[in-house]
Amino acid sequence: MTNLRKTHPLMKIVNHSFIDLPAPSNISAWWNFGSLLGVCLMIQILTGLFLAMHYTSDTLTAFSSVAHICRDVNYGWLIRNLHANGASMFFMCLFLHVGRGIYYGSYLYKETWNIGVVLLLTVMATAFVGYVLPWGQMSFWGATVITNLLSAIPYIGTTLAEWIWGSFAVDKATLTRFFAFHFILPFIITALVIVHLLFLHETGSNNPSGINPDSDKIPFHPYYTIKDALGLMFLLLTLLMLALFSPDSLGDPDNFSPANPLNTPPHIKPEWYFLFAYAILRSIPNKLGGVLALLASILILLIIPFLHTANQRSMMFRPISQTLFWILTANLITLTWIGGQPVEQPFIIIGQLASISYFMLILVLMPLAGLFENYMLKPKW
């Protein structure tokens, strides 16, 4: 009798995706983050669903409904802490996943990469509207500052901003629609994840060497299911440590105060995972220029496949490109630090230099390094 998992219409899909999937024999722990992101998404949807059962999206009661969840709902404090810190884990895994893709040349699978960039943008949008929901000071002012950027668009900007707000400022209508967006977007993300996997399974996984792995493949189960389980254990351990021992360490103290449109916080800043983009936005003194730089900082990922000049796919055997990659990593950490600092010297100039070097590294230095490495590898006799 033929195995049911190989014949049943639904189980056959699962089998080809997670069980009998041929995977390269040499993929490292850097390939764990895809499955970890799937787990993060499931955790966020489940905890979010339970939070939505008790949350009210009204400016008068939103803040107190979150307090009610933490005080009066059974394990509400835990669900909220898991959801808030789960977002941080989600972005940590996302950044490592994208970094892996850049280092090992996975971006040459263009369809998978482009869907991945769309996923990144959608997750960022979801996190932004979600941060507004508790209706604390930083929620309100963060929403005000970021939605106000739309008004920088020539001619239609102000109309567009008011259309998003549903009013003449961030108010009740804004909160209600942001809750609606925050509820629907994770399901759109889930659909995009399926498309992402569909394109990935058309080509198969890349591997650290960047060489075609077709001659040496192993079944996904049990080899990579057990390897993913180890990564999952570390993820859950870190998330639980954060949520149980230090749940507010990544949040902003200003968000413990209810939103007050008459009182501006001294430093308006987003959550840590947006600080690098926020630093790039602030580094340009012109409003429209800042908005364009902000968009470019993420959308630049879409042109990375066209900037690949090296004869080798992976950076595994390309020391100059490796050095530039780690400089880029340090640069992003610097931008994250600057994004959380007040707008004063020396932070302004450091932010501007880091922003310039971010674009220089990706657009100029890394493609040149690839060409130079090609030249160095040419036989000279």
UniProtKB/Swiss-Prot annotation:
Keyword RNA-binding in annotation: no
Q: Which UniProt keywords apply?
A: Electron transport, Heme, Iron, Membrane, Metal-binding, Mitochondrion, Mitochondrion inner membrane, Respiratory chain, Transmembrane, Transmembrane helix, Transport, Ubiquinone
The cellular component terms of Gene Ontology attached to this UniProt record, alphabetical and capped at eight, are: mitochondrial inner membrane; respiratory chain complex III
The residues that hold heme b b566 are 97, 196
Provide the GO MF annotations for this entry: metal ion binding; ubiquinol-cytochrome-c reductase activity
Identify the residues that bind heme b b562. Answer: 83, 182
According to the record, the segments passing through the membrane are 33-53, 77-98, 113-133, 178-198, 226-246, 288-308, 320-340, 347-367
What is a single Pfam family found in this protein's UniProt entry?
Cytochrom_B_C
A biological process from GO = mitochondrial electron transport, ubiquinol to cytochrome c
Cofactor(s) of this protein: heme b
Describe its membrane topology.
Multi-pass membrane protein
Q: Which domain of life is it from?
A: Eukaryota
User: Major place of localization?
Assistant: mitochondrion
**Cofactor remark:** Binds 2 heme b groups non-covalently.
Kindly list the places in or outside the cell where this protein is found, as annotated in its UniProt entry. Mitochondrion inner membrane
Q: Specify which residues bind a ubiquinone according to the UniProt entry for this protein.
A: 201
Q: Which family does the UniProt entry place this protein in?
A: Belongs to the cytochrome b family.
> Note on file?
Heme 1 (or BL or b562) is low-potential and absorbs at about 562 nm, and heme 2 (or BH or b566) is high-potential and absorbs at about 566 nm.
- UniProt function note: Component of the ubiquinol-cytochrome c reductase complex (complex III or cytochrome b-c1 complex) that is part of the mitochondrial respiratory chain. The b-c1 complex mediates electron transfer from ubiquinol to cytochrome c. Contributes to the generation of a proton gradient across the mitochondrial membrane that is then used for ATP synthesis.
| Subunit structure and binding partners | The cytochrome bc1 complex contains 11 subunits: 3 respiratory subunits (MT-CYB, CYC1 and UQCRFS1), 2 core proteins (UQCRC1 and UQCRC2) and 6 low-molecular weight proteins (UQCRH/QCR6, UQCRB/QCR7, UQCRQ/QCR8, UQCR10/QCR9, UQCR11/QCR10 and a cleavage product of UQCRFS1). This cytochrome bc1 complex then forms a dimer.
Any idea what this protein is called? Answer: Cytochrome b
Give the gene symbol.
Answer: MT-CYB
